[in-house]
């Protein structure tokens, strides 16, 4: 297999493994699969689990798509590639748990190639994972970052610090002056050594469940009431704001004529906004603000 096909094979297997693990953790609902084709080239398989015992909605999509001209969002940092044809493959997921004490999470791993006259002129990896709690626990956040740090260790002493910082900077809502959550890892435009970079992509993809599932198991049976549920729905609004205003993956998908249903799968099934909402001073809800700033968790 060529490089692209090797990455593609890994990603389809990763989607299968994550789906199996999430179904087992939920214990009730199953993923429904939607196979789709893209007119300009390629397609994918979108899988969504709804109304489970643990997950209100969990979406995970695989795609392998191509186009004749890079959209502006993809060539903004690489102007020399403007107008090149392209092919991209990736797995992207967002899980929205029902229990407000279980954090929302997002992960993405992807590979991109730009071509001119049928020849690959550039290729790179991107991805990461991040965590968005509503009622955070220090031990959960520390576990999350410990897994991230440990999977980065074989790739150099600076890898975790650099990609954690990139995550903090990327998942930041400037109009709210807060991070989307407690961070994790984020990277883009990783190139130069295909085998080493592919190893890192696999470490991130394979490490996601190690980081997330123990938190799910720890919090999924925590008792909650209407107050916690209402706060969860309110904070989900921040997720919507980020994805529709800032997220490059969303913008790329929409600009490249992607499949809207799959692109917007990341949005929560239920959400609310409230004008002028301020949590009660000293409350668990007010405490969340202390976590929405970049911090060294380890």
From Swiss-Prot:
Family statement: Belongs to the aerobic coproporphyrinogen-III oxidase family.
Natural source organism: Stenotrophomonas maltophilia (strain R551-3)
Keywords, in A-Z order: Cytoplasm, Heme biosynthesis, Metal-binding, Oxidoreductase, Porphyrin biosynthesis
Protein name according to UniProt: Oxygen-dependent coproporphyrinogen-III oxidase
Site note Important for dimerization, residues: 175
Gene name tied to this protein: hemF
Enzyme Commission no: 1.3.3.3
Biological processes annotated in GO: protoporphyrinogen IX biosynthetic process
Gene3D superfamilies, alphabetized: Coproporphyrinogen III oxidase, aerobic
PANTHER family: COPROPORPHYRINOGEN III OXIDASE, MITOCHONDRIAL, OXYGEN-DEPENDENT COPROPORPHYRINOGEN-III OXIDASE, MITOCHONDRIAL
Subunit architecture: Homodimer.
Residues involved in a divalent metal cation binding: 96, 106, 145, 175
Pathway(s) per entry: Porphyrin-containing compound metabolism; protoporphyrin-IX biosynthesis; protoporphyrinogen-IX from coproporphyrinogen-III (O2 route): step 1/1
Domain of life: Bacteria
Residues the record marks as active site: 106 (proton donor)
Region Important for dimerization, residue ranges: 239-274
The reaction(s) this protein catalyses: coproporphyrinogen III + O2 + 2 H(+) = protoporphyrinogen IX + 2 CO2 + 2 H2O
Main location class: cytoplasm
GO molecular function: coproporphyrinogen oxidase activity; metal ion binding; protein homodimerization activity
GO cellular component labels: cytoplasm
